[in-house]
Each structure stands twice: as C-alpha cells, then as structure tokens.
Swiss-Prot record:
Disulfide bonds: none annotated. Expressed in brain, kidney, liver and spleen. In brain, present in neurons but not in astrocytes (at protein level). Expressed in brain, thymus and spleen. One of its GO terms (molecular function) is L-aspartate N-acetyltransferase activity. It comes from Mus musculus. CDD domains: NAT_SF. Residues 143-280 form the N-acetyltransferase domain. Its EC number is 2.3.1.17. It is a single-pass membrane protein. It is found in: Cytoplasm; Microsome membrane; Mitochondrion membrane; Endoplasmic reticulum membrane. This is N-acetylaspartate synthetase. Residues 44-57 have a biased composition (Pro residues). The gene is Nat8l. It catalyses: L-aspartate + acetyl-CoA = N-acetyl-L-aspartate + CoA + H(+). GO terms for biological process: acetate metabolic process; aspartate metabolic process; positive regulation of dopamine uptake involved in synaptic transmission.
C-alpha cells in the first residue's frame, strides 16, 4: 500500500464542534492588524490555581509561537515540542476515528446516486424473494457493509499518516522552512493540534491536521488554531491559505467559513490514502472532498 504526502482530510476534522460566529468587521484587515501579536486568551474550563508564568524566551522560528497566557487561565496556542509527540498523535488518531460512523451513515446523505442504488437493491430483493422481512433486512445489511468498509479504509489511512508526517512531527513540520506545527494547551494538557505546510510554487500555505480533543470542544480552540495558521501565512508573506477536507459535519464547514475561507468546490472522486479502489470499496465507501481558500493578498 502506497502512502503519499499527507492531505488535509480533517481536519478538522471532521472534528470541529466549535462556536461559529463570524469575525467582526473586515476579516482580512482585522487579521493583518493582529499578525504580530498573540490572539486574546480564550475562556478556559474551571481548574486549579495556576503556577506563575514562565519567563519570556526567544521567539521560535514560526514567528507566532512564543509565550502565551499562563496555563490554567486560558488556552495557549504555541509551537509543538518534541515531548508532545504522543499527545499530538493521540488527538489526531481519536479525531480520525470519529470519521468511521460519520462517513458510513451521515455521509450517505451526500451521495443521492448511492441512495438510489441501495433502494434498487432493496426493490430487487423483494422482486426475487417476495419477502417483506428479507427486504426490510436489506437496508440494515447495506449500512453494516458501509460501516465495515469505512472502518477498513479509515484505519488504512491512519496507518499511512502515522508512518509518514505524524511519525516524526518535529522532523516533518518544525525543521523545513515554510512549515510549522502548533498545539493548544489548556491547564498543562495538549488539547488541540494544527499544522501548516508551504507550497512555494504558488506561494500558498496549506492548513493540515487540525483536530481538537473531544472533551474540550465548544471553547473556540479550533478557531484559535486556525487563526494561528493565518498569522503564520501573513507574517511570512504568503498570498493565500488553502485546505482540503472530507468533513461530513456541517460544524466543520461553518468553522472554516467563520475564519474567512471561501468554498472553492467539491469532488466525489477523491481517493483517500489507503484506499484499494476495489469494486466493493467503491460501492460501500464514498467521501466528498471539499476545497477551501482564504486569499490574503493579491500577487
């Protein structure tokens, strides 16, 4: 099985359940004003009293990954540290696993041709057997097969991701120029992740691997992570930020739109890393790939 370069099929999840109010005023102007500064602290869940804040250190290479608000008093978005490898992988892994039922069941609503095919199979079963009982069992069997193949493909995708960029985050994202990886820290725990990777050929930055721990959703953490990628792109003079996602939940798409992204189109023929493209897989597993773009400045 071949594993190509990582694609954003997430994010974000896929997994974002944040509040989705739009940025006030002109989005781009507000972002440009804030480009050199930390976004304001986000509200945190009640917790024990925090230790005194650490002393300020030198600015890391990402440009916006410096010291944030003290732990326990807000969410701090900062650059990834090597010791957080397993925590970041866990958040990514758990977020991707949520796609299995979402793709199998919710995702079916995005594919009317597949729904029609399944209805024809049920009708054919009744025409052949004349049994209402067997005909009623057909939808349950089809959904069971969708779950099986969704699980099979998504676990294969996870295997690819965990052995490519997510195998060594520091090497893949922190060392190459134009790339970075951030974590959201709340009360000393890593609760969210996001990555950025530059495409020098068209002077854009791709937002990747956005995911938030399910226990900490609803705190605008995903929005803060997305803003950090926008800051990074502006500070390094990239012209646009792009992302691709196979998210089924409407909440994820509303999140991207609240950050200022425009929906550029969708495709039903996207091949997820790890797919074998067998006939059964094509019949019981489908994803819709959405492309988003936020233009920061004209070239």
């Amino acid at each position: 099985m071949h594993c190509g370069p990582p694609d954003m099929v997430c994010e974000t999840k896929i997994v974002a359940t944040e509040d989705h109010e739009a940025l006030p005023g002109a989005k781009k102007d507000a972002l440009l004003v804030a480009a050199g500064a930390m976004w304001p602290p986000l509200p945190a869940a009640p917790g024990p009293a925090a230790a005194p804040p650490p002393a300020a250190g030198p600015q890391p290479h990402g440009g916006t990954g410096g010291a944030g608000p003290p732990e326990g008093r807000g969410v701090c978005i900062r650059e990834f540290r090597a010791a957080e490898q397993e925590a970041a992988r866990r958040i990514f892994y758990d977020g991707i696993l949520e796609r299995i039922p979402n793709t199998a069941f919710r995702g079916l609503r995005q594919h009317p041709r597949t729904q029609l095919l399944y209805a024809l199979l049920a009708a054919l079963c009744f025409a052949v057997t004349r049994s209402l009982l067997l005909t009623c069992l057909v939808p349950a069997g089809l959904l069971a097969l969708r779950y099986y193949y969704s699980r099979k493909v998504i676990l294969a995708y996870l295997e690819c991701a965990l052995h490519t960029d997510m195998a060594d985050i520091e090497q893949y994202y922190m060392k190459p120029p134009g790339s970075c990886f951030w974590v959201a820290v709340l009360d000393g725990n890593v609760v969210g992740i996001v990555a950025a990777r530059a495409h020098e050929e068209d002077n854009t930055v791709e937002l990747l691997r956005m995911s938030v721990d399910s226990r900490f959703r609803g705190k605008s953490i995903a929005k803060a992570l997305g803003r950090r990628v926008l800051e990074f792109a502006m500070l390094h003079n990239y012209s646009a930020v792009v992302l691709g996602t196979t998210a089924v939940k409407v909440a994820a798409h509303k999140l991207y739109e609240s950050l200022g992204f425009r929906h550029m189109g969708a495709s039903d023929h996207y091949v997820l890393p790890g797919m074998t493209l067998s006939l059964a897989e094509r019949l019981f597993f489908q994803v819709r790939y959405h492309r988003y773009r936020l233009q920061l400045r004209e070239e």
